[in-house]
């Protein structure tokens, strides 16, 4: 287990730290099997999550303090932007020493989320009940019971790589209002953030990739599709029978390999900002600089780039198919592992020649006719084509790409990396893992190809598949 920094830092750093911590709690590995991580049944029912790293120290009297983020699941199933939080508590006893612990708190009730949203604080064991979160086979029954009011919050903790029964009763989770104002704008509050009125920033991508994974959207159909037939936990062992449920959670967020790509999802397409938004998340000025007057009223519709220097335009990247995170080289001799989170991430600057998203209307369709892909970020949907034949005809006339028609002697195939439901007539819908016979393709995977699967033919985004 790496050392995570409990000292409050910028929301950008806290969000990346939270993604790393949450991944270690929800994705099995060779050490922790599927019955030793937070079960999908619990994650699916979660109304919110608080992810915190806490430092506990004491001599006669003990105290605990830490920092992290909180997110809420919205009514449409998407996730809110992260809100910065801190944790504080005190106790009495004979403890002598120091302990560093990562916590994931599962908020099972909307009341727990609402309590924090309204007042900016919740007291564990006070205004909300808390209990140790269930693991393994007892999880489904416990998660079902939680909806009946048994416990508003499930607590999971890990210290030095082991789950530990660390008591947190009496501890308070508090809003870090200054950090939120610094990041989002002068008048931003946790209520606005957790209600979905603030758009999700690019810095939250690693965290959203976990929140939108299969583990948080587990269904009984997924359980029934298990290779073992009916045993999801497989006697507590991590095996091929259960590992595929978690293969959409990356092992690292600094990788540029295939696992770091992420298709657009509901939260990544959500633009629901009823108040407008501060478009430049300036994460570099002083903590007390939030009173300088750049708030929600200063949204600039003509320039939506963030102040992260090399961060992408949100309208050009988060709404378009799989993206590649290009991490920078690690710094040497870092004392805290959290120092890694302050590094900028390399992105290619998107093409601003066209405005392909109407921010005032908040269009949420993944492949809408008004929002094609920008060059270099994925294929542009041929929105004016009524069927596949029209597509072939127009591509042959305009010479788009160097197409090659599949022959009977060597028909290429591809395996779907992501689900694609299709957005327009003529699209080829498929599920992750489906084998697609490629009928027509170009030399680039940032394009739309023609294929056949499950007895149907149509066009599909080539960067959603891996050519066999």
Curated annotation (Swiss-Prot):
Q: Where, if anywhere, are coiled coils annotated? A: none
GO BP annotation list: actin cortical patch localization; actin cytoskeleton organization; actin filament bundle assembly; endocytosis
Pfam families, alphabetized: SH3_1 (PF00018), Ysc84 (PF04366)
Question: Which spans does this entry mark as compositional bias, Basic and acidic residues?
Answer: 334-372
The subcellular location is: Cytoplasm, Cytoskeleton, Actin patch
Instruction: Recall the GO molecular function terms of this protein's record.
Output: actin filament binding; phosphatidylinositol binding
Q: Where do the SH3 domain residues begin and end?
A: 409-468
Annotated InterPro entries: SH3-like_dom_sf, SH3_domain, SH3_domain_YSC84-like, SYLF_SH3YL1-like, Ysc84_actin-binding
Q: Does the keyword Protein biosynthesis apply?
A: no
Q: Compositional bias (Low complexity) spans?
A: 309-322
Explain what induces or represses this protein's expression.
Induced during sporulation.
Q: Name one GO cellular component term.
A: actin cortical patch
Region Disordered: which residues?
A: 220-386
Residues spanning the signal sequence: none
Q: Where is the composition biased (Acidic residues)?
A: 248-257
Give the intrachain disulfide bonds. Answer: none
Ordered alphabetically, the record's keywords are: Cytoplasm, Cytoskeleton, Phosphoprotein, SH3 domain
Main location per UniProt? cytoplasm
List residues, modification Phosphoserine.
301, 311
Entry annotated with the keyword Disulfide bond? no
Q: What does this protein do?
A: Essential for the organization of the actin cytoskeleton, fluid phase endocytosis and vesicle trafficking, together with LSB5.
Q: Describe its partners and assembly state.
A: Interacts with LAS17 and SLA1.
Family the UniProt entry places it in: Belongs to the SH3YL1 family.
PANTHER family per the UniProt record, alphabetical:
SH3 DOMAIN-CONTAINING YSC84-LIKE PROTEIN 1, SH3YL1 PROTEIN
Q: Kindly provide the name given to this protein in its UniProt entry.
A: Protein YSC84
């Amino acid at each position: 287990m790496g050392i995570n920094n409990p000292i409050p830092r910028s929301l950008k750093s806290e969000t990346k730290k939270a993604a790393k911590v949450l991944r270690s709690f929800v994705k099995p590995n060779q050490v922790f099997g599927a019955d030793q991580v937070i079960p999908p049944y619990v994650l699916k029912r979660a109304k919110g999550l608080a992810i915190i790293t806490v430092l506990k120290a004491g001599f006669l009297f003990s105290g605990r303090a830490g920092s992290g983020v909180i997110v809420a699941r919205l009514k449409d199933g998407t996730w809110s932007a992260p809100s910065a939080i801190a944790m504080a508590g005190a106790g009495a006893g004979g403890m002598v020493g120091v302990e560093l612990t990562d916590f994931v708190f599962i908020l099972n009730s909307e009341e727990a989320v609402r309590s924090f949203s309204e007042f900016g604080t919740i007291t564990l064991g006070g205004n909300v009940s808390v209990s140790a979160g269930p693991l393994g086979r007892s999880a489904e029954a416990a998660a079902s019971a939680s909806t009946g009011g048994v416990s508003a919050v499930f607590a999971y903790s890990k210290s030095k790589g082991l789950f530990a029964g660390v008591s947190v009763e009496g501890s308070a989770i508090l809003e870090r209002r200054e950090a939120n104002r610094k990041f989002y704008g002068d008048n931003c509050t946790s209520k606005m953030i957790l209600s979905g009125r603030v758009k999700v920033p690019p810095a939250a991508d690693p965290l959203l990739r976990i929140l939108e994974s299969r583990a948080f959207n587990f269904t009984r159909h997924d359980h029934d599709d298990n290779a073992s037939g009916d045993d999801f936990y497989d006697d507590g062992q991590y095996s091929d029978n259960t590992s595929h449920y978690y293969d959409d959670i990356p092992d690292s967020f600094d990788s540029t390999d295939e696992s770091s790509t992420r298709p657009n999802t509901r939260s990544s397409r959500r633009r629901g900002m009823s108040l407008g938004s501060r478009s430049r998340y300036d994460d570099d000025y002083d903590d007390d600089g939030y009173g300088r007057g750049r708030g929600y009223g200063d949204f600039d519709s003509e320039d939506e780039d963030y102040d992260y220097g090399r961060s992408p335009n949100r309208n050009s990247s988060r709404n378009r198919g799989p993206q590649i995170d290009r991490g920078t080289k690690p710094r040497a001799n870092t004392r805290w592992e959290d120092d890694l989170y302050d590094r900028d991430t390399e992105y290619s600057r998107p093409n601003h020649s066209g405005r392909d998203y109407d921010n005032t209307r908040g269009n949420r369709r993944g492949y809408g006719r008004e929002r094609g892909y920008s060059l270099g970020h994925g294929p542009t949907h041929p929105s004016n084509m009524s069927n596949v034949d029209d597509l072939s005809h127009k591509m042959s006339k305009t010479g788009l790409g160097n197409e090659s028609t599949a022959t009977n002697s060597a028909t290429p195939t591809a395996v779907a990396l992501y689900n694609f439901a299709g957005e327009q007539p003529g699209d080829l819908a498929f599920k992750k893992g489906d084998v697609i016979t490629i009928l027509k393709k170009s030399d680039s995977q940032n394009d739309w190809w023609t294929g056949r699967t499950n007895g149907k033919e149509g066009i599909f985004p080539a960067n959603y598949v891996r050519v066999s």
